[in-house]
């Protein structure tokens, strides 16, 4: 067996679920502002603690995210949404606040709590998760789709779900009427 050279004591950090930048967090973030979003992803993935210096460096550099291409941001966002424990974002007010500052379109993070039981048993598809977090009366999903130039498939799914939600809100008897129609058609076919 070879020896592990660990000058940054990373092995200890892994044992203690600490995710942090190597060296000066300020310098690491300034080298690539996408590291802020990656930090959030790893923080959720490993359910780790946030050091004060890291927290301050992130807050100080949030504006740097504007300099990153939307495509790179979207790739990292999708990696975050695909985490099995994404819902744990709500367990940390600090992390939720950072996420909301970077992605203000996701104004419905409270809805994640309703999905906790589903998350415990299976992974929720990304499109559905986007719909839950984005769709509201303000058409946030349309702004998000435009801002990040998402695929047409995701746009269509979000628009379809948004339109269905509008129909449900406008017509309180939506399900009853649909049920009656389906029962009628089912009886007619037999």
Placement of each model-derived feature along the sequence:
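Glycine- and charge-enriched loop/helix tracts that form the active or gating conduit
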Residues: 1-146
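Divalent metal-dependent catalytic cores for phosphoryl transfer on phosphate-bearing substrates
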Residues: 113-190
